[in-house]
Amino acid sequence: MIKLAIALAADSAASITTPTGPKVFNTANKLFALSKFAPVGLLVYNAPEINGVPLEVIVKEYREHIGRKRFQTLKEYVDSFSSFLQDGPPMGKESQEINFGGLVHFGLRQVYLRAVRIRRHDETPSHDFNVYLRRAVDELVKVAKRRGRLKAFEDIDAEKVWKERRQLLSKLHEIVIEQFKEEHEIPDLPGKLRKDIEMAAILVVFSKGRLAGYTGIVIAGYGDKEYFPSYVQYETDGFTPYGLRCTDADMSTISHTNGAELGAFAQREMTQRHLEQ
């Protein structure tokens, strides 16, 4: 990005998270015009979809929605696109429920994976796996509190969420237990430990920190009243019944004192390698 122009570039590889693990596609489209009538583009990295809907489809719908309308600043384009996502039909209640279930499943797996790692490094391992689950819960809760809540979830009562979603949480928990039983001996869980594991998973979802299946978005270009280009970058895990799981937007702008900038997203080591050549 310089005073005269901004360029976006991406490879064609994209990944999505599935119940059996991540899958990589090597023919994904990652660059889109956000408007047909204004110099504003969108780049997507990592997962090319939000709530299971491909970004390519969402952007096409947004272009139809915005038509010939133009904005004075790039930030207004970002806000307009975010509002469209929030109100658009593809992000309805069913989609939000499914996405929340996927995020909680990830959080539950983090508890069990951490317990496995703790036992692996224990010089005098216990035969009771629940000992390690308890330690994993305590550690993850501390991590979540240290990171703090994402903005959308700051005022959400995790205890209330657990009560509202007990049936879903129990079902997902059993799925995770069965997955880990294939390689590990998982004893019956005391009621309090079971609840604490599920509460820890909720806190993982609500706290700041990158999850595996995130979608990275970069919106770049000019507003009608802007002389220099800028870009806004953020990462999202999609919509849930409690709000959008999304990082704070990070904006970079060219100015009289900042004449050039190079931004790298996802695999930053590729950019570093390019600069060293």
Please identify what each model-predicted range represents.
Residues 1-277:
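N-terminal nucleophile
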